[in-house]
Amino acid sequence: MIVLGIDPALGKLGWAVVAKESTKLHYLASGTIKTHSKDEIHNRLAFINSILEKVILEYQPNIAAIEETFVNTNNVTSLKLGYARGAIMSLIGRYNLDMQEFKPNTVKKTVTGYGHAGKEQILYMIKHLISGTDLITNSDEADAVALAYTCLVAKKY
């Protein structure tokens, strides 16, 4: 089973690919996709999708794990995040991947045991739970790894 974890964002999206063979988890890859706020939104969305499409084609995931969003007090920010999620979900659908959504607190609780854990705690724990993640220093990538981990553990794949 190969999971593509996605921490959705318009400005700086985190992604990670984690595989499970029998009971062992293997970190395969991760990265961030940065877009510039000065670019047109449709170009930013197209750029995100072009990178994620390359990841899907290279690693052939079976399922995508994506973070559920919460409504921000800033309506514009929430709307832009919704655009990014919609574009990502469209890509997931185009490649006929299964998709699971997880609330941020569920991911935090699964990875750290505490539903209100901070970014540093998540980063610390993924390095202990999944070999090969030692070099991850970016919280967006760490969140994506945590999403993939949660999917594999919570859904018992």
UniProtKB/Swiss-Prot annotation:
This is Crossover junction endodeoxyribonuclease RuvC. Keywords: Cytoplasm, DNA damage, DNA recombination, DNA repair, DNA-binding, Endonuclease, Hydrolase, Magnesium, Metal-binding, Nuclease. Its main location: cytoplasm. InterPro entries: RNaseH-like_sf (IPR012337), RNaseH_sf (IPR036397), X-over_junc_endoDNase_Mg_BS (IPR020563), X-over_junc_endoDNase_RuvC (IPR002176). It is found in: Cytoplasm. CDD domains: RuvC (cd16962). Binds 2 Mg(2+) ion per subunit. Its EC number is 3.1.21.10. It comes from Rickettsia prowazekii (strain Madrid E). It catalyses: Endonucleolytic cleavage at a junction such as a reciprocal single-stranded crossover between two homologous DNA duplexes (Holliday junction). Pfam families: RuvC. Mg(2+) 2 binds at residue 67. The active site is at residues 7, 67, 140. One of its GO terms (biological process) is DNA repair.
